[in-house]
Each structure stands twice: as C-alpha cells, then as structure tokens.
C-alpha cells in the first residue's frame, strides 16, 4: 500500500512514521521545502521530537521525501494532507488554500486516491470541498498531537475521530487501528461537520483551562496570595484534575490561538458568551502581565527565550512575542535584550540578541521568562515568570 503524506511538519512527519512502521506500507513525504526533504533523505529529523529523532537513528531507509508531485501520487492509495492552515485575521477564517492546492494536484494526477485531511479546518469545510472538487473520497480525521510528543501521540492516541460513516470511513479507521501501538483505543465515526467540531471545541476547552488558571493567578497577584497553593487546592478535586493548570503569560503556539478564533467565527449569529471570553481573556492576560513587568521599572529588560514551550524548536505564534510588542507599545523607550539560541541574527524585532547567557544575565536587571528552566536557577532573583509548577502541562 502506498501512502503519501503531504506536509513535513510535526503532524505530517508523525503520521509518516506511524504508517512506515508497517513494512507493508510504502510511505512518501511530499513538501515544497527542499531543506526538509534533504534532511529526511539524509535520515535526519527536521523537527525536534525525541521519539522521531530516535526513529531516524534506528530506521535508516524507511522514509523517502520528494517535491515531485507526479512521483508522489503515482499509484498511491491514500494521501494524508497535513499542510498548515493559518488563521487569516482579515477574513476571520482559516487560510485553507494549501489544502485546495493539494486537492487540485490529486484530482489532476490520480483522482482515485483516498484523501485524509489532518489539517485543522473550519466547521463545514469538508462537505464544501467535496462538492467543489466533485470528490467523494475525502475524509476529515482530526489530529490531537502535542508538539514535541507528536509521534508518541500518534502511536498512543487518546481517541480516533473519523469524519465519515461510510465504508471509506471504516477503511480509514481500520488503517489507523492497524498501525497504532495502543490497544483498545476508542474510535468514533461521525459526520464530517461533527468531526471538525470535535477538533475546534477540544482545543478551545484546553484554551479555556489555560485562561481560567491564568485568571486565578492574576487574582492572586493583585491580592498578594500564593497562586500555587490556590491552584493545588482547586486541582485536587478529581472532577477538575491536576493538568493544564500551570499559569503562564498566556496561551500561544500554533493551535490554540487560531482554533479558538476560528470557533468564535463559526459562532457567527449564534448567541455565545464563553467562546468569546476565551479569546478575550488571553489578550487581557497578556496586557496584565505587561503592566506587571512595567511596574517593576527595569532599566534593561531581558527576554529569556522566544520559544512557545519548553524544548520547542520554534517560536511560531509564541506568547512572549506578543508580550514584547505590548511592552514596546506601552513604553517605546524600554531597552530590551533577547536571549534565544534559535535566533542567529544580531537583532530580532529590532531588538538586540545576546546569545552568551552569562553576558545576557549580567547586562539586564530583570528577566522575563514564560517558562522557568534550570539555566535560570543561578540568577532566579532577577527572573519574573508566572510559571509556578515548572511544567508546560
């Protein structure tokens, strides 16, 4: 069986490895990024994920990547679309053009391929494109992967959602069940609109938890209370749970900001209060944190890491970047220095980058860190962070 994975991000790569572990499958990765293609063909992971990196060490010739669409789609049985769908602030909608471009190629080259969409899409999207392209062989199956743990979450999924109740949906469900490691996983077959809803509502619930515990922390800070003690007491209730409860500067990253905004857009003309509040509370929190930082009146403020979470290899839509922008908006004269080893340039957002940590620590009188790590221990008296449990969960 030949399976094409379109998009070499953490979702695409995790799915590629999942299917390639079965020797009956031929897996081809398709992307336009020649650096990622070269990395995979040289048996190196283009993303940071311990299990994925381990796979490349142990399975030298399992995966092949290409930018040649004809080569990729020739004789393929399935295509998994895992291309980015960023949120367009002007349109108030996901930018789904990458998916449609893939579907155009598939229809022109090999229209018999069964298409599985893993990219996050608006509610109602799958039905729309099936009509637009006159293709009945398109199924939406959302992913619930964490960046940094994408392969583990693919092998041991919390559940499998298939947005199709037909024979094709059952075939795709069996395809995943045959390749995952977890036994007795729940699999749900439903309408595509419902599967799309599961994805957006799931991430919006997680964003709601982040927002809730951030507001607990905001209250505690204003009243000089210990937020860690309060949160521990709240979370000890099994109905609430001891997860996703660590305060932060706000939620960021690739999924939660865009998915909450898309769900709110899907609520157009539907009475709602909570969904809107989840989006708003994140901006309120970032502004609140910015004011707390400015109240400390630092002469030189250090920004420790731009990454969205601990051990990430990127800072796409990172909350700390929003904090920087608010700082510059509220006080244009504030002097900032960034420590971020991932940035090789001397400046970022027109701010000096200092990647000698000792020099960085000596130059600044206050350091802000969305997440605290061991590197900061020796200068912890200089650090301002909302992180009370030292975890991303």
UniProtKB/Swiss-Prot annotation:
It comes from Campylobacter jejuni subsp. jejuni serotype O:2 (strain ATCC 700819 / NCTC 11168). The keyword Protein transport does not apply. Its EC number is 1.1.1.22. It holds the Pfam family UDPG_MGDP_dh_C. The gene is kfiD. Catalyzes the formation of UDP-glucuronic acid which is required for capsular polysaccharide synthesis. Does not catalyze the formation of glucuronamide moiety of the capsular polysaccharide. The active site is at 255 (nucleophile). NAD(+) binds at residues 11, 31, 36, 85, 120, 147, 254, 258, 316. Homodimer. Keywords: Capsule biogenesis/degradation, NAD, Oxidoreductase. One of its GO terms (biological process) is capsule polysaccharide biosynthetic process. This is UDP-glucose 6-dehydrogenase. It catalyses: UDP-alpha-D-glucose + 2 NAD(+) + H2O = UDP-alpha-D-glucuronate + 2 NADH + 3 H(+).
